[in-house]
Amino acid sequence: LTKEKPQAENLEIIELDIPVATGFSNETIIFTASWEEEGEKLSEKFVGRMEPKDGGMFPVQRPGLEKSCYLQHRIMKTVAEQNVVPIPSLLSYEENLESINRSFFAMSFVEGEIPSDNPRYTVEGFLVDSSSPEERKILIEDGLRAMAGIHSIKWKEAGLEWLDSSGTGKPNT
């Protein structure tokens, strides 16, 4: 945050939450930072994603992409630049944040409920237990719109050719 907010004084993390059932690719933390700027006390909530200690669950897709946290940040940044789906504001990617000794990035916090990865949100949790059919319909339709938006990105024009490990212009899936 000191890079993102160089004018901030007395910057500190005042709240920290580690959700237990979200994020297979990287670990998720939710934190609130406070600081002073020109004599005014400010605070903001963020979501952090950090590289798992064990290196993550996905195989390396190609040399130079060993860090899934880097891959996620770079793709999210491109998706945000394309403006095809709502996406939180991203902060910088940190290759090896000294205080946690891992790769890390943060983004703005968006209020809402987080569907669980374990147990699957389609089996247990708020979506099954307390959502109305209309709320489930909205979630599914919003998800489909987001997927369609992402699939509308012209990957070469968006600068994603670095994902093509085949080098042929026809990426392996």
What function would you assign to each model-found segment?
Residues L1-I18:
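Juxta-kinase regulatory segment immediately upstream of eukaryotic protein kinase catalytic domains
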Residues D17-T173:
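ATP-binding pocket architecture of kinase catalytic cores
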